[in-house]
């Protein structure tokens, strides 16, 4: 196997490869760009005009997605996967990956769309670098652009595998992309309705990519992800890379949700009235007092069918401590 196929091994060891560019036996170029960043380029005659960005490790302890990208890279380096797409593989927070921690000081996935400019430290610098790597990769005109940012969650979930679809004024959410996610094993998609500061929000809003944050299960250490089943996603990614993806327009069984409200933590007095082990997609009854903060701020459930995702009262002041979502239909899709 080509040495550049061992990007994860190089990254965890903090080493640069001796050779920055290598070719597989069938002419696929693998090019090391910087720590945790590797571009795969098919021979010109096989290039189908699509660009795919695959990122993981934005949170360093979310290892199942990292291992998935590692397997795909190994397959390409061995010549078992024969790309027709350009692919950029990114491991996000490399130092946190080495330490087995979610992040060191700042949550990298809250530092995009310019937010890194308002912060200092290595994680703000890394977010800026990731933006630049993505911007450069998606700079070629006339090509399709797709970004999957792969994660696992801090807590359990009543719907284990789901996607978050960013929002931009004037753009419609794509039925075709949701059918593709359905085929890849996603059980639900959250359609967002405001701008955000995540990596996929940046690539969707600024770089005109179709972009999705994919949540694949519970976060576990390296080598302990037997309980995270990513087989359908892995197959679909191979098909996208190789240009052999079967056409599908089916949304059968895919649950769609819309954001109703975000719960923002304003002060250290913030209280979230949920058990510490509450699962994502837990239902909340109308009238339930969800949270309280200074100045008599109260979040009371008003919505029918409301559910909570990403509840986290420990976030820094000013950040999102949870999202209230409600069921929606495919009538909103383009």
UniProtKB/Swiss-Prot annotation:
Co-factor binding details: Binds 1 zinc ion per subunit.
Catalytic center residues: 215
Cofactor: Zn(2+)
A GO MF term: zinc ion binding
Gene name as annotated: astE
Any one GO BP annotation for this protein: arginine catabolic process to succinate
Key words, A-Z: Arginine metabolism, Hydrolase, Metal-binding, Zinc
The keyword Hydrolase is assigned to this record: yes
Protein family (similarity comment): Belongs to the AspA/AstE family. Succinylglutamate desuccinylase subfamily.
EC top class, as a word: hydrolase
Enzyme Commission designation: 3.5.1.96
Name the UniProt record assigns to this protein: Succinylglutamate desuccinylase
Domain of life of the organism encoding this protein: Bacteria
Catalysed conversion reaction: N-succinyl-L-glutamate + H2O = L-glutamate + succinate
Species of provenance: Pseudomonas fluorescens (strain SBW25)
InterPro entries given in the database record: AspA/AstE_fam, AstE_AspA_cat, Aste_AspA_hybrid_dom, SuccinylGlu_desuccinylase
Residue sites binding Zn(2+) per the record: 59, 62, 151
Pathway: Amino-acid degradation; L-arginine degradation via AST pathway; L-glutamate and succinate from L-arginine: step 5/5
Reported function: Transforms N(2)-succinylglutamate into succinate and glutamate.
């Amino acid at each position: 196997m080509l040495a550049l196929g061992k990007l994860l091994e190089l990254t965890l060891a903090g080493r640069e490869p001796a050779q920055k560019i290598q070719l597989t036996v069938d002419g696929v170029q693998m090019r090391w760009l910087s720590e945790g960043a590797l571009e795969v380029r098919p021979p010109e005659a096989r290039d189908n005009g699509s660009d795919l960005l695959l990122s993981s490790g934005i949170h360093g302890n979310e290892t199942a997605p990292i291992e998935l990208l590692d397997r795909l890279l190994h397959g390409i380096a061995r010549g078992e996967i024969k790309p027709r797409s350009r692919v950029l593989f990114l491991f996000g927070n490399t130092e946190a990956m080495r330490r087995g921690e979610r992040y060191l000081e700042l949550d990298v996935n809250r530092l995009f769309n310019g937010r890194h400019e308002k912060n200092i430290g290595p994680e703000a610098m890394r977010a800026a670098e990731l933006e630049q790597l993505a911007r450069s990769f998606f700079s070629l005109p006339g090509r399709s652009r797709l970004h999957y940012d792969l994660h696992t969650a801090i807590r359990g979930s009543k719907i284990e595998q789901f996607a978050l679809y960013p929002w931009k004024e004037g753009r419609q959410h794509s039925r075709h992309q949701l059918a593709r996610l359905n085929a890849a094993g996603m059980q639900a998609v959250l359609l967002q309705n405001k701008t955000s500061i995540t990596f996929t929000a940046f690539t969707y809003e600024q770089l005109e990519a179709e972009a999705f944050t994919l949540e694949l299960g519970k976060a576990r250490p390296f080598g302990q992800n037997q309980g995270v089943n990513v087989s359908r996603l892995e197959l679909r990614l191979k098909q996208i890379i190789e240009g052999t993806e079967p056409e599908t327009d089916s949304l059968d069984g895919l649950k769609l949700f819309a954001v109703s409200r975000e719960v923002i933590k304003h002060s250290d007095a913030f209280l979230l009235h949920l058990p510490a082990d509450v699962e994502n997609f837990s239902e909340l009854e109308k009238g339930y007092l969800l949270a309280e903060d200074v100045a008599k701020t109260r979040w009371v459930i008003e919505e029918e069918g409301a559910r909570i995702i990403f509840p986290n009262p420990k976030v820094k002041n000013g950040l999102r401590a949870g999202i209230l979502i409600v069921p929606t239909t495919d009538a909103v899709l383009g």
